[in-house]
Design a protein with these regions (language model features):
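Mixed-charge interfacial surface used for oligomerization/domain docking
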Residues: 3-5, 10-27, 31-38, 86, ...
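Class I S-adenosyl-L-methionine
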Residues: 38-93, 98-101, 105-106, 112-113
Length: 192
């Protein structure tokens, strides 16, 4: 039976409840946030409370919104190397939607370098935030029960296909300014 390591990008928000992800042994690959002239690793150098506090102080959101960047190659490699050092045979990495940036592709490229060392399954969740994180949590619970990687992937893919999230954003302006909400959708959102 393979020993399976579960990983997730920081956009999965699982570190909002650190005792939960730590008890399940989930590793987090940190996305970078560029804000107010500084670079942070999401959820590590900049916690959510401080992030939102700083966000509220922005005087000109059109020109000063935070931006994100992919994790460093070295950080991804550290996660994979740690899994190998800890005796894992396989890793399943749940990644934020590839439609939102290049993180999925970057992790896939790094994973190819480990083909003979660790069997890595990189999963484009087509989600972000808690939807992504819930998949990693369920996968870690399944791994703890002794399920195989194939069984875990089957269960979490089913969940991906059947998840629906509804979110409320009190300030659609941020989604419009950063280009995530455009055209008619932006117009309709502002009417609501």
């Amino acid at each position: 039976m393979s020993k399976i390591k579960i990983m997730c990008t920081s956009t999965g928000c699982i570190d909002y409840a650190p005792e939960r992800y730590k008890s399940l042994g989930i590793d987090i690959i940190r996305i970078h946030v560029f804000f107010n002239g500084k670079e942070y690793r999401e959820g590590f150098d900049l916690d959510p409370v401080e992030f939102y506090r700083q966000l509220e102080t922005i005087e000109d959101p059109k020109n000063h919104l935070p931006t994100t960047g992919m994790p460093d190659t070295e950080e991804i490699m550290e996660c994979f190397d740690r899994a190998i050092a800890d005796g894992y045979d396989e890793a399943i990495v749940y990644v934020l939607s590839s439609a939102l940036g290049g993180t999925y592709n970057k992790i896939c490229l790094v994973a190819k370098e480990y083909e003979n060392k660790l069997k890595i399954h990189v999963i484009d969740t087509h989600l972000t935030c808690f939807g992504e994180g819930l998949l990693a949590i369920k996968a870690a619970e399944y791994a703890a029960k002794g399920m195989s990687a194939e069984e875990i992937l089957k269960e979490t893919r089913w969940s991906m296909d059947h998840q629906e999230f509804i979110g409320v954003d009190g300030k659609l302006d941020y989604l419009i300014y950063n280009g995530r909400l455009k055209g008619g959708k932006a117009f309709m959102g502002q009417l609501l």
